[in-house]
């Protein structure tokens, strides 16, 4: 009889991962997350980071973190509903509401927590959640926590969405349509105006997870809702503070009613300590910086367009991305992972993405160009893509 403490069942599952070629070890960075990094002791060009604007190591933002620690200490010490709600947390929510051009904002400890806490808080038995089939895992998990019924519509397929809405028009008290603003694996933008039109036509609420749109799309990076001019017509907008903003945390933007309800029923808010002052102070500075200039978003888009053009000219399939996210689609899963490995051996770190994260036969490496990259770095990366692509007969 096996010793239960040896966790033999997990050892067997781990071996299955190794047999399938999808076992991985956590890469170790030796320094800040920038355009070039020290990874496992080797200097490489970084094309895997969500640090879109280069804010994660921005000197002005780092100083704001240090100043906040000096004034407030290193931790909040409690959940916000008890004694963990400092005036700096309130200031952050005011700044974010101004940035997102919404009535109110509720900050959570992560973007994942936003979806885990909000979806279950605003839906219940007798409601229907209608989710794009390619939505982020945190949306899927958040929906699972709700007692509402769930269904999906084909990715960005408005005819299918309308069919689902028609079929369920009179069956539920409330309906909630959920979509990513920008889909992280392909970089495509949700057809949000059409979704909102259908939601209003059939009396449904709209919920947008804008993790990869905030700081990227819209005026000064205000996001997908701003990009399409849909303020006041989207009920819940989720934003992350760990990607373009460069720190940690997430938020829900919407009405005062939304915020009031989540302060009573948002479980991650109620049962987990609030963000530490250093994070809050640095986020405030980052958002103010973003509102004050388009320098960083302009540089991001300039770099993204430059890289896409160069990679496409080599003959790689980069899909139909409408954002800086640039998938280089290889196809067969094993080749995609081998391509990623060879790129790293040649000084470029870019993540291999395979099933079940993407559909079978669409294995890829996902390139994340940032405002922090120089043209020289991007040129070097393109040369490595060309070299490895030719060696593997991909070009």
From Swiss-Prot:
Annotated metabolic or biological route of this protein: Cofactor biosynthesis; biotin biosynthesis
PROSITE patterns in alphabetical order: AA_TRANSFER_CLASS_2
Binding-site residues, substrate: 24, 136, 357
N6-(pyridoxal phosphate)lysine modifications at: 243
Binding site for pyridoxal 5'-phosphate: 111-112, 184, 209-212, 240-243
Assembly behavior: Homodimer.
Full protein name: 8-amino-7-oxononanoate synthase
Organism this protein belongs to: Alkaliphilus metalliredigens (strain QYMF)
